[in-house]
Amino acid sequence: MKPTWKKSLTAAVLSVSLVLTASPAALLAEESGAAVQSVRGQYALTPLVRADVKSVSSVRIQDGTKIGAVVRLYNEGNRVTRVPEYELRVKTADGIEYTLRASAANAKAIQPKEKVDLSYMLTLDYIDATALAELSWVEVDEYVYPKLETPIMSVPVNGIVWNGSDSAISDVGAVKQWGEPFMLPVQSDSLQYTPVTLINEKTPQGPATVITLIAENKGTRTETVPDFRIDGKSDSRSYPGVRAEANVELKPGEKKYIHYGILTENDVVLNSLNVLTPETFVQLGASNTPTVESYTVGRLSVVLPPKSTIDINTLPIYKLRDRIAFDPLNKLVDKETEVSLVDLSMNESESAGYNTIIAKFMVKNTGERPVPLPAFQTELTNAEGFRYSGTRQTTSVEQLAPKLAYLVNYSYAVPSSEKGEDLLMKLQDNQTIAPYNIPIAGFKTAVAENKSEDPDMLSFYPYNVKLLSSAVSIQGSATGQFGYKMKLDLDITTVDDVIADVNSANMKIDLVDNSGRMIATQTVPFIGVNKLISGTQYLLFQNLRSDQFEWPLTVKLYESIQTPTGEANRLLKTMKQ
């Protein structure tokens, strides 16, 4: 796969030079518990200037080979010193030597105790350039004839050359296992990264793998996570990753998540990750206009686990109404927002062929200030691994008042064969790194059995309805039309102090004849106009589906909830009249 060399114009070489000059940081870092990427060691270039090879690359392009090298120089003195005016050359394994061109943005001097990165590049028409073996600094005196060349120092590079995104990292010290912390000393000696979750999901753009790292500042001053890329690698090719967060600042001791989304292809299995850092080279055009060429260099490889990293066996068994434990680093649900699952039921749908699971979550603000109502996403996974995404109830509420709770429903369309016995519930953040979902909580659960010690006590969470008595009678009219009148005596109580939407739960009443046909129906809310109340009330059924009198009748009481796919009904009680 040919590499992509991005080109962009800048206003001045000075601005590019500022970008290329990093803040002071040692290349070698000793971090207990973290696998630190080794560097080539430091070399004495002059009595005051020491050198390191930061990166070397040799990448095939469409018309040849592009060789890049970046060296890092340190001023060990107490005064500003000039960058030695040496040529940088590269030698192949066949003994062919090339002189690299210096970037127009390379620094001319080094502040005391500071460092600078010098970039070099050369494009060859020769496609089959052999492996690079050595970098060397050469002092050239062009003011004598013949010109005088004095070798200063040579550094072996045969083990660190990057050959492009599809190449493999074979250095044992640069291959890390999943979950093993690592650092990138070429960027920072204080920031540590630990891969923690890997999730495969489908997106409108195609299959994607979402990687989550914990970035931790081990140092003593605030740092910004530098730019680096993570690519996914299969057996045949690599897939570029994109970081979701633009600017991540870490105070000393602080931890934050950073995420990468890697778009792949159908049936592709990633087996490793390549961690790459950016390099730049600036060249001047005919009119002294600077052009920046950006490229990346592989630093280390992370071996991927064979499947998603969420271990179902480690997730707790959930008890309804308990507070759900969220990832403490999540950005969607704060510590003062309490979320609990209060009901999980299986419902029949209007259309044949599938059922609907309804999950009711109570979201409570335990703090003293209004907070946003968190719009988390949910997903159910059954024992066979089939995943069902939840559809959130539409609500106009955006803020939670202090000490108040709000009820939010989620619906899941499932096959009619689904029993709902062994389910995994995942709560996800689908906003922080949209369009990807990242898990922020998870637990094992099951659909609640529709059983009650009292057959006349019906649950329409957040309401309990005690059916004291009921009766159905014929209702005639002067025009000869008839209907049915139902008398209901109810005792309605609220289970929790929670604000419920008008569509959170309704009572649906069906009148069914001896043949099992529904001849009349009515849905009555618990909120708003014509709501159900405690005490005696009468309901009229006039829009009948039969033109003749039917008797006896069967009365069926359902909990009815509107979902985007239609009405979902849960049968609560059947009564013969």
Where are these regions (language model features)?
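Asparagine-centered strand-capping/turn motif at beta-strand->loop junctions
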Residues: 73-80, 215-221, 363-368, 490-497
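Accessory, solvent-exposed terminal regions and/or long lumenal/extracellular loops of proteins
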Residues: 430-433, 437-445, 450-472, 483-501, ...
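Short, solvent-exposed, Trp/other aromatic-anchored flexible loops in extracytoplasmic proteins
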Residues: 100-131, 237-286, 387-429, 518-562
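Short, solvent-exposed loop/turn segments enriched in Ser/Thr/Gly
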Residues: 64-70, 207-212, 353-359, 484-487
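Sec-dependent N-terminal signal peptides of Gram-positive bacterial secreted proteins and lipoproteins
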Residues: 1-30
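A eukaryote-biased signal for short, well-structured alpha-helical docking elements
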Residues: 24-45, 139-186, 283-334, 429-466
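Short acidic, flexible loop segments centered on an aromatic residue
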Residues: 80-97, 220-237, 370-387, 502-515
